[in-house]
C-alpha cells in the first residue's frame, strides 16, 4: 500500500536533485571550459579553415565581377523565379556564396543576395573603394606604403580593376591611374587574400 502523497514527494525530490546537479555541473563546467576555450582558440589560430567548393569545383565564397551591362538577379536558381532587381553596372564586384547547377547565389556590397546565371559573371577581379566610408575620399598611392605620395583621390564607391594584392595592399587601376590602396579599404577582396592577375 502506497503512502498518500509519496509519489509527488518522489517527483519533487527528483526534480530538486536534477536542478542541483545542473548547478554543480554548470559551475564545474564553466571553470574547465575557460581553459579548453583558450586551447581551442590557439588551435584554431594555427589551422587554416577548410575550403568549401561549389558545383563548379571552385572555392566558396569567392569574389567575381558582373560580365554584362544588365544582369537580372532572381529569387531562386531558375528562369522561372521572379526577378528581384537588375544590376546595370558591368564590372561590379559581387561575392558568390552558393552554387546550384549553373546558377550562382551572389551578395553585393550592401549585403543583398539573389541568384544569377553563371555566364553573366566573370572571374576577373574588381573592387569598390570603401563603399561604407561615405563621402571621405581615399588616396591612391604611388607605392604600397602609408607614407607614399598620392597619385589620385578616390571617392567612396568607385569601381576599380584589381591588378594584384599582397595580403595587405592592392594595386588597382581606375580611369588611367594605377596605384596602391590599403586592402582593408576595398570591397571585393578578402582580408589577407593574395591576388595575382
Predicted features along the sequence, with ranges:
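Short, electropositive, low-hydrophobicity segments enriched in small/polar residues
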Residues: 80
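SH3-family beta-barrel domains
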Residues: 8-12, 20, 24-72, 86-90, ...
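Localized chelating/binding microdomains
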Residues: 16
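N-terminal secretory signal peptides that target proteins for export/translocation
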Residues: 1-6
Amino acid at each position: 500500500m502506497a503512502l498518500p502523497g509519496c509519489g509527488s514527494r518522489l517527483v519533487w525530490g527528483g526534480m530538486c536533485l536534477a536542478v542541483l546537479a545542473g548547478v554543480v555541473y554548470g559551475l564545474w563546467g564553466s571553470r574547465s571550459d575557460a581553459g579548453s576555450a583558450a586551447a581551442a582558440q590557439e588551435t584554431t589560430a594555427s589551422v587554416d579553415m577548410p575550403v568549401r567548393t561549389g558545383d563548379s569545383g571552385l572555392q566558396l565564397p569567392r569574389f567575381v565581377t558582373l560580365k554584362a551591362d544588365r544582369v537580372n538577379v532572381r529569387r531562386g536558381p531558375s528562369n522561372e523565379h521572379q526577378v528581384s532587381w537588375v544590376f546595370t553596372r558591368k564590372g561590379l564586384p559581387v561575392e558568390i556564396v552558393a552554387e546550384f547547377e549553373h546558377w550562382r547565389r551572389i551578395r553585393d556590397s550592401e549585403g543583398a543576395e539573389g541568384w544569377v546565371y553563371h555566364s553573366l559573371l566573370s572571374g576577373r577581379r574588381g573592387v569598390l573603394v570603401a563603399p561604407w566610408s561615405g563621402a571621405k575620399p581615399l588616396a591612391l598611392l604611388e607605392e604600397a606604403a602609408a607614407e607614399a605620395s598620392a597619385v589620385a583621390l578616390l571617392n567612396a564607391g568607385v569601381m576599380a580593376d584589381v591588378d594584384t594584392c599582397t595580403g595587405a595592399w592592392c594595386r588597382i587601376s581606375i580611369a588611367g591611374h594605377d596605384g596602391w590602396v590599403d586592402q582593408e579599404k576595398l570591397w571585393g577582396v578578402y582580408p589577407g587574400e593574395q591576388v595575382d592577375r
